[in-house]
Amino acid sequence: MVAILHADVEAEFIGHMASALLARPEAYADSVMVRNRVPTETTSDPWPASKRLIVVRDDGGPTTQDVRATARIGVRVWAATEAETSDLALLAAALVRGWRSPVVRRTEPTRPYSVTEESRRPAAYFTAELTIRGRALPTA
């Protein structure tokens, strides 16, 4: 059996989402921080001034007998208001739904839902399953 190397799904998501949002005309798509962890809110790692943040988490997933795998991701979205958070989360889910690349072959996002927590910052959450394509690991 050939060893298969799969891409870093979080890095792929961050690159895709950040560039896709830059191309969008909606005001709530402007100045969105996209990363794989929540800021610590220290001087060196502040919450974004725009209050717009998208955080992705790779939740793993099974591989197949060929070069494919299923990557499950969780996506959290924050913005200044409940309405803006909802709009940004719906846009992010749509951008995931349309995402195709040499690595990502198919996506199935869920609909976002509100998950505002103790911080009182408006937040939403959705998940997606991605069919990703790996490549044969070169021999050493």
Regions found by a protein language model. Name each.
Residues 1-62:
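Small/polar-rich, solvent-exposed N-terminal microdomains that initiate assembly or binding
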